[in-house]
């Protein structure tokens, strides 16, 4: 590893939530750069380069560290530092092993790094939770201890993936030193077999244009992987419909088949409750390769699985119908719902959908209008208040094709 120590004082702009970009290799704020070299489908090298980071000074005198694209670690009572993950495609049965080949860092003297309040659920007001400072603040060690680690493998329809998490910023509270890794190079290769989420079975007609597009954006090594080349096609779609709405939904089904998306509609009464629906969907997935499910009816008419974890325990979960393979939460099927209570609602949804797809009007003004809704809470992503985050999104939209983006923000929104 290469080491550099820089003794410097960070001069922050005064004011509420003042934020300063600290350059390591890049003058302007930018997301880290990922590059990869696929030596084979069982062996890949990855480079991670960080050009700088933000220091946000909070009203309580504490400082928050972030960088573009990073997310907080959410370990309660530990220094609130950012991390970033990227997924790679891995062999169906392999155990992958990671080693660090290169790591360059810079040390900055810095104190008063804020702690994390942990992973708060939506029913908890962050302002009601006090900051705590745990064991990491009393230990003469850099936190987090690992700058790179791998999560468990997962399955996404026809491919098996694994997320690699980079934690390029560490903090030693005793030495009051912030360590920033500007460059990390790792090697990931197969080493034996894994018992965690092996990919043992694929659906029939597994090619799907929509999922191929997801793979290309989601996996760092997708474009360099030839093992999973398939003849891609659209769909198919399964419509599970409340019986009283079947006739009203038929034009939608006919249209989808007409445009080349094989679509089948089934009365939910012929299937049963959520357990029976899950079993029915699994059969359709492996036998027909369905890529879409559309539920038609409200929750009392088309039930969904319920789980008892976190806030909103026992709440219905439509997306759970799409989890077919493995014990992860990556979908094999995309799930949607026409949440209709009566046929009038269904007619509206069917007509709007068909008209939108058949008669697009790219010159219409509404295509170029948007609205942003934000609370007065924060800081969150990139150390930004909610309204600041929405303003950044608004700037991006206005710089693209949008002409109007409303700002509906607390407390006046």
Q: Positions of the model-derived regions?
A:
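Generic domain-boundary/flexible-linker signal
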Residues: 175, 304, 381-383
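Metal-dependent DNA phosphodiester-chemistry modules and their immediately adjacent helices/loops
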Residues: 309-343
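Short, conserved secondary-structure transition motifs
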Residues: 272, 297-303, 377, 412-413
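Sec-dependent N-terminal signal peptides
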Residues: 3-14
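Short secondary-structure capping/junction motifs at helix and strand boundaries
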Residues: 4, 288-292, 364
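Hydrophobic or amphipathic alpha-helical targeting/insertion segments
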Residues: 280-320
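Extracellular pro-sequences of secreted precursors
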Residues: 18-295
């Amino acid at each position: 590893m290469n080491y550099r120590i820089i003794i410097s004082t960070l001069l922050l702009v005064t004011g509420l939530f003042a934020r300063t970009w600290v350059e390591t290799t890049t003058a302007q704020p930018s997301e880290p750069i990922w590059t990869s070299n696929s030596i084979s489908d069982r062996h890949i090298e990855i480079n991670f380069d960080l050009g700088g980071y933000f220091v946000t000074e909070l009203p309580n005198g504490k400082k928050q560290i972030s960088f573009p694209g990073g997310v907080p670690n959410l370990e309660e009572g530990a220094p609130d530092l950012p991390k970033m993950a990227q997924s790679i495609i891995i062999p169906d049965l392999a155990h992958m092993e990671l080693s660090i080949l290169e790591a360059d860092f810079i040390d900055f003297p810095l104190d008063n790094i804020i702690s994390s309040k942990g992973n708060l659920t939506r029913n908890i007001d962050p302002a009601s939770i006090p900051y705590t400072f745990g064991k990491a603040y009393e230990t003469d060690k850099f936190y987090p201890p690992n700058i790179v680690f791998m999560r468990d493998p997962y399955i996404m329809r026809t491919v098996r993936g694994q997320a690699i998490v980079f934690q390029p910023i560490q903090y030693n509270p005793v030495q009051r030193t912030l360590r920033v890794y500007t460059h990390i190079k790792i090697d990931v290769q197969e080493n034996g077999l894994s018992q965690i989420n092996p990919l043992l079975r694929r659906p029939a007609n597994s090619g799907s244009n929509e999922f191929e597009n997801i793979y290309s954006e989601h996996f760092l090594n997708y474009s360099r992987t030839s093992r999973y080349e398939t003849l891609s096609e659209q769909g198919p779609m399964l419509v599970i419909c409340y019986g009283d709405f079947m006739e009203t939904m038929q034009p939608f089904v006919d249209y989808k088949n007409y445009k080349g998306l094989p679509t089948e509609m089934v009365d939910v009464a012929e299937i049963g409750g959520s357990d029976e629906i899950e079993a029915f969907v699994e059969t359709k997935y492996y036998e027909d390769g369905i890529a879409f499910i559309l539920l038609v009816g409200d929750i009392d008419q088309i039930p969904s699985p319920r789980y008892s974890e976190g806030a909103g325990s026992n709440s219905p979960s439509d997306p759970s119908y799409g989890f077919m393979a493995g014990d992860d939460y990556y979908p094999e099927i995309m799930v949607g719902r026409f949440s209709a209570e009566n046929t009038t609602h269904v007619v509206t949804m069917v007509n709007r959908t068909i008209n939108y797809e058949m008669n697009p009007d790219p010159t219409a003004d509404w295509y170029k209008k948007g609205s942003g809704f934000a609370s007065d809470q924060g800081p969150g992503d990139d150390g930004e208040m909610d309204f600041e985050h929405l303003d950044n999104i608004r700037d991006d939209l206005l710089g693209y094709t949008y002409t109007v983006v409303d700002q509906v923000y607390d407390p006046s929104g």
